[in-house]
Design a protein with these regions (language model features):
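Carboxylate-rich helix-loop segments that flank metal/cofactor sites and access channels
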Residues: 49-99, 151-152
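Preference for long, well-ordered alpha-helical segments
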Residues: 94-157
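Alpha-helical bundle segments that constitute or directly flank the non-heme di-iron/ferroxidase center
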Residues: 1-28, 85-110
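Membrane-interacting alpha-helical segments
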Residues: 1-4, 58, 72, 78-84, ...
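Alpha-helical scaffold segments that form or flank carboxylate-/histidine-based iron centers
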Residues: 2-10, 30-49, 84-88, 113-127
Length: 157
C-alpha cells in the first residue's frame, strides 16, 4: 500500500468514527460519558483535518467521503447503541478497529517524517480512547451516575 493510499484510508476511517460517535452520543444517557465521547469525536475530526492538510502538502487531494464500510459502521452503532452501556460496547469495537489500523500505519515504510508524526500522534489518541472506554466498561460507570448526568444520591440506587 502506498503512503498516500494509507493516509486516504485513515481519513475514511476517521470519517466513519465521527459518524459512529454521533450515534453513540445520541444513545448515551449519562452526561459525563456523553461529554467524553464528544471529546473523542473531536479528536477524530482533528485527525481528518490534519491528515487532509498533510495530503495537500504532498500534492494530493484528500477524499473525505465515507464509503460503504462507513455506512455499515454507522448503522451498526445506531442499531446496537441503546443506552450508555451499549453505546460504550459499540464504540469499544469501533476503537479496537481504529487503533489496529493506526498501529499498522505507524509501521509503514516510505512515509514522510511529517506524515509519520501525525500518524503517531493520532495513534496515541486512539490508544487513549480505547483505554478510557475499556475503563468505563470495567468500572460500569453507568451504574455510578443517574441518566442525565446526576450522580446517585446517598441511599438511592
Amino acid at each position: 500500500m502506498t503512503p498516500i493510499r494509507a493516509v486516504q484510508d485513515l481519513i475514511h476511517l476517521d470519517m466513519d468514527a465521527i459518524k459512529a460517535y454521533e450515534q453513540a452520543i445520541k444513545a448515551c444517557e449519562h452526561e459525563n460519558v456523553k461529554s467524553q465521547l464528544k471529546s473523542f469525536q473531536g479528536d477524530h475530526q482533528r485527525h481528518v483535518q490534519d491528515l487532509s492538510e498533510e495530503l495537500r502538502k504532498l500534492g494530493e487531494q484528500p477524499d473525505a467521503r465515507t464509503d460503504i464500510k462507513g455506512f455499515f459502521i454507522e448503522a451498526f452503532t445506531a442499531v446496537t447503541a441503546h443506552g450508555t452501556k451499549s453505546a460504550l460496547l459499540a464504540m469499544r469495537g469501533n476503537e479496537q478497529l481504529t487503533t489496529a489500523r493506526y498501529k499498522a500505519a505507524v509501521d509503514l515504510q516510505d512515509v514522510p517524517d511529517s506524515t509519520k508524526e501525525i500518524i503517531r500522534k493520532n495513534y496515541a489518541d486512539e490508544q487513549r480512547h480505547l483505554e478510557w472506554i475499556k475503563m468505563a466498561l470495567d468500572q460500569k460507570i453507568w451504574e455510578q451516575e443517574k441518566p442525565g448526568g446526576q450522580p446517585p444520591q446517598p441511599g438511592q440506587p
